[in-house]
Structures are given as C-alpha cells and as structure tokens.
Amino acid sequence: MSNSTTGLVKWFNEEKGFGFITQDNGGDDVFVHFRSITSDGFKTLAEGQKVSFEVEQGQKGLQAANVVAL
C-alpha cells in the first residue's frame, strides 16, 4: 500500500522525533518519524509545513515514508 500524496504537518515533536501529517485528500492523519524525512542535517518538520510523502501500513497504523518538504 504505497502511494505518493501531499499534506500538511499537523504537529511534530523535535525532542521525540515524531509527529503527524494531515493528508490533503482527507484521509486519516499519518504518523511520521524523523527517519522518514529525506533531508540533510537535522531532520525536523514545522507545524503547517507542506510535504509530499508515501503512505505505508505500519505496525500501529498508517505511517509516512520518503517525506519531502515542499
């Protein structure tokens, strides 16, 4: 279940390294871990930031992969 989509960062906790993304298509919010962010240096996201990502089924529900800030 891997498809590319876009969304906005709902929230992201830099200290814990995770947060959630609200999908533009109205689907369920998607968990995002800092390891899924494709950027150099410190991997973090800002609330309200536009991102593209792939949705995968994780152990505890939907999770984001290959997250790219737009």
Swiss-Prot record:
InterPro entries: Cold_shock_CspA, CSD, CSD_CS, CSP_DNA-bd, NA-bd_OB-fold. Its main location: cytoplasm. Induction: By cold shock. One of its GO terms (molecular function) is DNA binding. Keywords: Activator, Cytoplasm, DNA-binding, Stress response, Transcription, Transcription regulation. It is found in: Cytoplasm. It comes from the Bacteria. The keyword Heme does not apply. GO terms for cellular component: cytosol. The keyword Metal-binding does not apply. Residues 7-67 form the CSD domain. It holds the Pfam family CSD. PANTHER family: COLD SHOCK DOMAIN PROTEIN 2 (PTHR46565), COLD SHOCK DOMAIN-CONTAINING PROTEIN 4 (PTHR46565:SF20). This is Cold shock-like protein CspG. The lineage of its organism: Bacteria, Pseudomonadati, Pseudomonadota, Gammaproteobacteria, Alteromonadales.
